[in-house]
Each structure stands twice: as C-alpha cells, then as structure tokens.
Amino acid sequence: MANIASAKKRARQAEERRLRNKSRRSEMRTSMKKVLKAVKTGDHDQAQQAYRGAVRVLDRSANRGIIHKNKAARHKSRLNAKVRSLAG
C-alpha cells in the first residue's frame, strides 16, 4: 500500500477509472452481441438498427481510450459485413 499522499490518490483514481472502463467495455460488448443476435435471427432491419447503436458505442470507446481506434474499426467492419450479408 502506498504511503505517499500522491501515490494514494493515484491508486484511488486508477480504481475509479478501472470500474468506469469496465462498465463501458461491458456496454460495448453488449451492443455488439445485439447485432450478432439480430443477424442470427435474420432480421435485417433490427440488425441495421443494432449496428448503428454499436458503431456509436465503439467510436465512443475508441475516442475515450478504452480500446484502440483500429480495434473499433475492425469490429465495425466485421459487424457491417454480417449485416450486409442479410441484405443480399
């Protein structure tokens, strides 16, 4: 355990950020699962709507530093390919 006040504060801040990031990461994963579930059922409109929501969450996560921008782009690309496969 830290003895110096600034180190104690940093430990507190790190824990708060860890919990916040955990929540945001969970939100991101849930939004992606909604898209995959809609694709699995074959509902194109619902999949499209879920995809739009997932893109927002992924972009927000990338901008906040929860995930890397390339990882967000990769997820969006793969989800979009699955949604497009329903259309044609």
From Swiss-Prot:
Q: Which Pfam families match?
A: Ribosomal_S20p (PF01649)
Which top-rank group of organisms is this from?
Bacteria
Q: Which UniProt keywords apply?
A: Ribonucleoprotein, Ribosomal protein, RNA-binding, rRNA-binding
Q: Give me the segments passing through the membrane.
A: none
A single Gene Ontology CC term: small ribosomal subunit
The answer to whether UniProt assigns keyword Ribonucleoprotein to this entry is yes
Q: Which InterPro entries match?
A: Ribosomal_bS20, Ribosomal_bS20_sf
Indicate yes or no for the key word Hydrolase.
no
Q: A GO biological process this protein is involved in? A: translation
Basic and acidic residues compositional bias, start-end: 12-30
Renumbered to this chain, region (Disordered) spans: 1-32
Q: Kindly list the GO molecular function terms attached to this UniProt entry.
A: small ribosomal subunit rRNA binding; structural constituent of ribosome
- Could you say which protein family the record assigns here? Belongs to the bacterial ribosomal protein bS20 family.
What's the stated role of this polypeptide?
Answer: Binds directly to 16S ribosomal RNA.
List, alphabetically, the PANTHER family matched: 30S RIBOSOMAL PROTEIN S20, SMALL RIBOSOMAL SUBUNIT PROTEIN BS20C
> What is the protein named?
Small ribosomal subunit protein bS20
Give the species this sequence originates from: Halorhodospira halophila (strain DSM 244 / SL1)
